[in-house]
Amino acid sequence: MTKRAGLPLGRAFLVLILLSAADSLFFSSFPRSALQLFSSVLFTDAAEPDSDATPGLRPQPSPRTFRPTGYQRIEVKTVDEELPEDLKVYTASTRGSSSRTFEVRNAGGRQEGFTLSVLTAGGPLPHGSWSWSGTPPEVQTTGGSQISFGWVPDTETPSLPERNLLQLKRMLRDEGLIEAVQLRAAEKGCPVAVLHNLRQLPVNFREVLHEEYESRSNPAKMYEVANSYVQQRGSDAARWSVSQSVELSLLEMHATSTTDPRGSSAVPSFLETGPQVRVAMTDAVPSGIRVYATPPAPRPVPVQSNQTEKERSPTSKRLVGMQLGLYLICKLAALFGHPTLFLNPYYTEQQLLEAVAQALGIAPPHRGDFENEGNEAQATANQHNGSADQLLAAIEIFRLGPNPYTIGHVLTLMIAYLDYESFFGASPSKPFHSWVSLAASAGNNTGFAMLDEMCDNHRGPKRRGQKHWYQTGGARKHKNRDMLPLHRQLCDALELVLNGVQQIQIDLMDELGKYKTGVEPLVDPATNSARIHTRTCRGLSPVCDYEATILAPVRALEPHEQQDSLRTKKAFNLVTGYGSGHVGQITGSIAEPFSHSWRTRWGKVVADPTAYGEIFERTLWFDDRELMAKSSGALFRQYDRIAKDSMSFGVFMNVENGLLKKDMRSKLEAYISQRKSFVEKRQQSRFAKLRKKIPENDPYALRAAIFLALNSRTFCAQPTSFLSSFRTFLTNQYHKLSQGRNLPRSQRSLMAFMRTGQVKFFQEWCSFDPLAVNALFLFRFAVSGTDPAALHDRQHTRVSRNKKTMRILNSKWTPAVLKKLMRKVNHKHMAREAKALLLRSLDPTVLSSIVTAFDFITHTQANLEVNQNAFMYHEVRAREVSRQSAAEKGSHRLHERGLVRETDDMIKRWAEHGIPGDIKRRLARGEKLPEGMSFGGIPIPNLTNWDAQLNSKWLEAYNAYLRHPYGRAALNARDPVALLVKDSRDRLQAEAEGTIFLGRIAKRVHQSKNLLRRAGRALKTFFLSLLRENERSEYAVWFGVKVDMRQVIQTCRQINSVAEVVKNDRLYDFITDGWMELVKDVVAGYTKASVRVPGFDTISAANEQLRKEGVAAATARNQGFLSIHYDYANLPEEERKKEFQRSMCMEQCEALWKLVMAFVMPNLQNPKKLKGYEKDFSGAKEIEKLNSPHHVNAFRFSLSVQIDFFDNMLDKTSKKNLKAMKFGASTWFTYAMKLAGQVNSEMGNPNLGTALYMQAAYYGNYIRKWMEQRRKSRKQAIIGVLTLGMMGLYALLNVADIVQHMEDIGGAPPVSCVTNEILGVTCAPQAIAKATTSAARVATQDFLKVGLFAGMAPYLMLPMAVVSVWNILKSEIKVLLQFEMALKHTFTRLKRWLAAPFKNWWAKRGRLKDALFRRASQTYRKTEQETKQPPRPRNLHNPSSWGDTELDSLGVPPEPFVQDFEIKYTTPVFPMSAPLIKA
């Protein structure tokens, strides 16, 4: 009797059980009975593991056998007792599947031990048990060692051997990886072979590998197959192979694209069953099981010549690339997609690891078990080390695909095999870490420390100021000198891969940090994964997939939104997949849902060999060596030197036509044998001790193998050698880029090749081969010497170091004049070069974001009506009956002084809210506050939604205009301006939350070409700039806009990626200018200005020379002019919306991009600065302070805000506009700070963004005072310069006067005179003694002495000089002025304190003088009255007759009472805040 059950693939745990009388007899014939339960696999006549079966033979289809398609799971329990007749098997499923109990009847139990093997599909088995009485015992799963939420229970710590073995077990028996590999292979149509012993694994993998090599070696055949599938063709076949499965997948893809109206494919799919499809199944197959169709037979390919590059169509290239990608999937499935092997507890981890190494070729073939290893086996292993087979097998690791997670997984396993005794021997000496643990820990540099432990690296102590792994990696040392060269090189390769993975870790954290998921780089992966699930899963589910999170889109996305959503999905899958690498000791059903989800997700990441290629490209992002050149770059010159070197033994000669696999092997064997002979001769030489010792183990053998592999035809479907073809391709690309001019070396490096868009041409040339980047990686690895990882770290350090000029330009201490000089030199030429670089480097789709990144909400003309022209609608003469109430009367009124003046006043009121006038006066004078007064007691305004309050003012103004009789009449007449006001009102009501209002000063247009007037304007501009004054404009041109921040930042990231290529060149400073040139061109072409501006010439507007000549109509207008379609009122609704956007973009897009780039680019170029601010605001206490009265009032009163956003981040045009605004500067800067907050929140600094938004109103009020102080400081600086100049002139004149005086009195030096008949008498000074100094030194000393004495002695000019120098410095170095403003009251009190002694002395002197005169007068009169005659002069030395006196012993009258105050500093408030005065 037979029972069978079927459940959907991937969800059922137990699907089918076949038991019958015949089966019972069949099982009883085995010495160890095995009951096997398959999900979709029927029993075959399979032997036990490692039984004597013929290797390589696959089971033939039989009436009771068909291919397994799902995930399989094995649980084994050995019972050393008699199996009873009522044996029961209990299975429990996960959420969503059923639990079943199956009864097994086995007549006549046996007395010996039995093994019960349970194979399940679709997921882990939380509990599986069997018993014959009572509660069935629990059986742990292999996933039971996972923990959730990063908590490790207080239990005994496992030993080093146990930890190492557990890590290896998790890599080899990764259920999620095996399941994902199987499912992906099934989706792509790869053949599935059920292997029954480990000896079949290398044979199976080598068969797939051989088919791939055969296909790659014949690119003409691949293109013939690809071209045939461009049209609809296909046929049936009776044979099954990897190459045919590739063709089948292409056929399926074509069939799904050519479906009939009913949705059925025109070509039978391999997942269908029908008369055209042969199915390897019988009637015993359960219904609903997914089965495979036999693929079509390959068509005979006629012999033809290889196609040239021009003859290959892009469609055919992409199909060839798909074919090659399918081979990679099938290879990975042949290597790891065998649950019957990797999940079988019969095999140890040692056996599984050696089987994988044998399949790749790292281990010698057909080697015995580890535990039975003898001297002969050890000798075989030693002989295999460094052999041609092992070296070519090492290259095969990098041919598994461009997925760095796949490569890293295999590299880690091979490192474990090569150093097995150190990791898993009887006495292991170092820890072993799984690949997922290394990748998950790379974000905080811990992964490199773990890798150093595995590979015996020593990076040394971290130097002061160094915080990155690559800054110490360039000088790291190898501790183990006995390590095999191949082992060392695989470690270096793994470190390079880990470098690429680490570079995206911060991006992943920033991407998920935008949604406030709570991820942190220093937190363990399991905790980060649990945080993400807890905060993003819908329905409060503890674990979910990306599609079930709030991050998944719920509507159709735009193209740029799709890229952003894909980036978020990758970040979610990677960070949550890292959780599977956190090993702990929590077991049971609580941790199982989390660990299973994380294992499954990580398995999908590793199982796709063609995914995440952009991460693997990052391993090449920092190589600044020359790649493209006229003939050969630095990398190819290094290759040529190696090829011509005598130690290469000529194996690289005559390889231009491409090598076959057998040729590679023969050349590599010849190289190994010749080097071995050379070393032996060298050692036997009599001069061996005098010469440099050559190691017996060749450190350059892998390099030779890589060069031979790259000279084959197995890369990029090239008919000749890859390296020779690639050299030709680079030469052609160089000529296309240079176009006859000298292209800088930095733009021809490998780094530039990968970052500036050249790689996309390389991919197309390479027929979209998935291994294209792998070939570049191997080439760079081979020409990087004996330590490629150290070289990579040194290059990374050199490239990442900020230029000195950039540090100077962004420094607070740099004078403004120096910044201008550094920027102005050759500015226009550098901007054009930057534009050319961006134009050839950026994806053309990026340019569309120039106009789509901004959604204009309100129109300039609408704002002109309610702001500049508001006075026209202030008083309305109408009948009183038309106004029923005061509210209606007020609704017709607009702000008489303009709207922005009202918003400025509102911001000022917020900044001074709750502060009495007496307190403000006391603070301004630095006096003490009243008793009991504190900052915490002053009320603060409610600015939670300050932008909504400001936006409501604009709405009120629009409504007032539309209610005004003129506005109503204009709207009824469909006046374009009235329609713009109405459209702006409607859009602002719908998008009020994200709208930002900004203003620009309309440029004055000077049409006169009179030379005198132009000279007068230039002279006026010079004096205004000298005084830091501007031609003030009462009103600006205002508009409302909503910024698509994600699209803007995505564009800026791509721009910055291009900019980093030229980071060490001066061009780096002009990338923003180059982008602005591109913006001008795109806006001019998109907006069609000629439609709305009569006489507008697009060509002359885009041409700088024509703009100078005044040909363009744009020079005769400014942003305040009406620029709208002449028939705007009659346009359809959709066209009117488009015209609204185009007319605004024509005027404002350029200015908006300047402002946005000023905020975003410094964040990308110098992220440490804003990360420091983010850290300051990230604490819970700092967040609470944002609404704390004490903190807010200290912030308002101290005026100690940072002005980086104004000085170092605002663009030049915005600064000029802001300084020229007579009204509206506070409003503009307040909204600009809101924009800066949005930028920082989107870029992963949410706390800083929140702080900027909450304090924006105070910033706006402060910036007005800041600009006033800057104007005053310039005037003080001018006075200081004049003072110092006069002092210097005075000293110079005194020196000249002294010299002239000496000459007049005969003190001149002696001279020697000579009489000449032609010239007459000539006299020269005569030396009377040996000179002890130079004349210049004497003159300088005299000048300084005279100046110093003149300043100190007679006039006390030294303090004047110090004050003058201070005024000049604070005028040019803005941080000094900021410091003075912040400590203004402290300086006032300090000045009073310093002046008090002099003031008191002068007061005492005055009082003494008055007392002396008064006493003398009284004495004189008294004496005169007594003697009746004028008194005689008294003796000044005998004061006894002076009478009574009120003077003290020193002759000084007593002092009046003076009230003293004590200066105390209160609790620290905002940085650099002024102290308070308390009595």
UniProtKB/Swiss-Prot annotation:
Q: TM spans, by residue?
A: 1278-1298
Subcellular localization is given as: Secreted; Cytoplasm; Host cell membrane
Primary localization class, coarse: secreted
Specify the effect of residue 1323 to A: Impairs interaction with AMA1 and inhibits host cell invasion
Query: Which pairs of Cys residues are joined through disulfide bonds in the record?
Result: 1313-1323
Residue ranges, Extracellular side: 1299-1479
List the ranges whose topology is Cytoplasmic.
25-1277
Task performed by this protein: Essential rhoptry neck protein that plays an important role in host cell invasion. Upon host invasion by tachyzoites, the protein is injected into the host cell where it functions as a receptor for apical membrane antigen 1 (AMA1) on the parasite. Part of the moving junction (MJ) complex, a ringlike structure formed between the plasma membranes of the apical tip of the parasite and the target host cell. During invasion, the MJ migrates from the anterior to the posterior of the parasite, leading to internalization of the parasite into a parasitophorous vacuole (PV).
Family designation: Belongs to the apicomplexan parasites RON2 family.
Subunit field text: Component of the moving junction (MJ) complex, composed of AMA1, a transmembrane protein on the parasite surface, and a complex of the rhoptry neck proteins RON2, RON4, RON5 and RON8 localized to the cytoplasmic face of the host plasma membrane. Interacts (via C-terminus) with AMA1 (via ectodomain); RON2 serves as the receptor for AMA1 on the host plasma membrane. AMA1 and the RON proteins are initially in distinct compartments within the parasite, namely the micronemes and the rhoptries, and interaction happens only upon initiation of invasion when the micronemes and rhoptries discharge.
The entry's protein name is Rhoptry neck protein 2
Q: What is the species of this protein?
A: Toxoplasma gondii (strain ATCC 50611 / Me49)
User: Gene name?
Assistant: RON2
